[in-house]
């Protein structure tokens, strides 16, 4: 009986390692540029804001519309986004844990992936920069 318990434990350990590797490999898959291409809303908020309070105060000073292009360049209101980041973003690329923006002066800004279709980071000022799909754009 002890040898069958050891065999079962060994089989279970092997199965757990295999499942863990598969799950990790899936989590590291990069999104294709075509999957993310389109209009995105960049929103600047304080850590205390929630979706409801943010919706009530959306105004040009805390929101700008940018376009992630398939060729991994940016369009739209990149100057607005650049004011918050300190360097106007001109290129972008996906990473396993989010999205990076590259500025005109080669600065790199990393936005971590959050639930669903939005990315975010906390700026040095403590404000939160969130990049989310433009709600008025139809889903791909």
Swiss-Prot record:
Inhibitor of the alkaline protease. Pfam families: Inh. Residues 1-25 form the signal peptide. Its main location: periplasm. It is found in: Periplasm. One of its GO terms (cellular component) is periplasmic space. Belongs to the protease inhibitor I38 family. This is Alkaline proteinase inhibitor. GO terms for molecular function: endopeptidase inhibitor activity. Keywords: Metalloenzyme inhibitor, Metalloprotease inhibitor, Periplasm, Protease inhibitor, Signal.
């Amino acid at each position: 009986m002890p040898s069958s318990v050891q065999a079962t434990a060994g089989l279970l350990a092997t199965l757990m390692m295999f499942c863990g590797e598969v799950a990790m490999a899936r989590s590291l898959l990069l999104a294709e540029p075509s999957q993310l291409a389109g209009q995105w809303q960049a929103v600047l908020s304080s850590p205390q804001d929630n979706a409801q309070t943010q919706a009530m105060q959306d105004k040009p000073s805390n929101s700008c519309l940018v376009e992630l292009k398939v060729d991994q360049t940016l369009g739209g209101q990149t100057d607005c986004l650049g004011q918050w980041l300190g360097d106007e973003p001109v290129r972008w690329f996906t990473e396993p844990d989010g999205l990076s923006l590259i500025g005109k002066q080669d600065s790199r800004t990393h936005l971590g992936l959050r639930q669903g279709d939005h990315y975010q980071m906390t700026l040095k000022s403590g404000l939160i920069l969130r990049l989310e799909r433009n709600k008025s754009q139809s889903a791909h």
